[in-house]
Structures are given as C-alpha cells and as structure tokens.
Amino acid sequence: FNDVTVGTRGGWIDDERALAQDGDCWIYDENSVVFAGATVSGNARLTLPCVVSHDARIGDSCWLDGAEVSHGARISDNVTIQQSCVRGECHIYDEARVLHHSVVIAAKGLTPDHDQILQIYDKATVSQSRIVHQAQIY
C-alpha cells in the first residue's frame, strides 16, 4: 500500500509474527488488535477498529473493515468483511463478502459429516444475516 511509510503507526499485535514481514499487509487503525496466535499476511489490510484473535488467519488480498474474526477462522483470497463478526473454524474465500452487521458462527460436528466446516466462497454476499454451524454458501 503506497500510503504506508516507515514510521507510520498502525494497530497492535501481541507478537511480531502476527503481522507478516513479507507482502504489504497492514493494520491501519490504532484501535485494531491482532493477538492470541492470529496472523495477518500477504496483502491483507485492516481498516477501522478490527479484532483478530485466537488462531484466525487473514491472508492474500483480504480487506477487513471494522470486523471481528476469531477462533480458527480462515479468510483468504479477495474476501471483504465489513462491520461483521466471524467466529469458529470456517473458511471464507474467493471473492466472498460478509457485510452490514452479519454474524458467522461456525461449529463442526453438528451433522453426520463431523469434519465439514462452514464455508462462504465464490462470489457469495452475506448481508445483515446470521450464518451458523456448517453452512455452505456460494
């Protein structure tokens, strides 16, 4: 990102490994935090206050804007998450969007396929919704 220069203050991390040193990932808002084993990598960017925690993985060219992501969630490719919350072991990828105060709560083991995880992918858009368990949205 061309707007980040040496010495620019960003958000908080609890471990230098939380923010990858390769790529152009950045935590823009000083009120954002990445902690408890969570990582931000690639060209991912976090704007507005964000909380990323508990082994969540944010990578590639994702954009989190005022979002909370935690508990093993994987966000990759070109995903946008705005003003929403994603919790639990799930994968949101491709060009999916989670918008407008949506809540994603993933939980494995609630169907006969105990290994299936919640996924939102392709060009799916979730807006003002609650998505739970092992849903597959595309």
Identify the residue ranges that each predicted region occupies:
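Functional cleft and adjacent loop/helix regions within the main domain
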Residues: 1-22
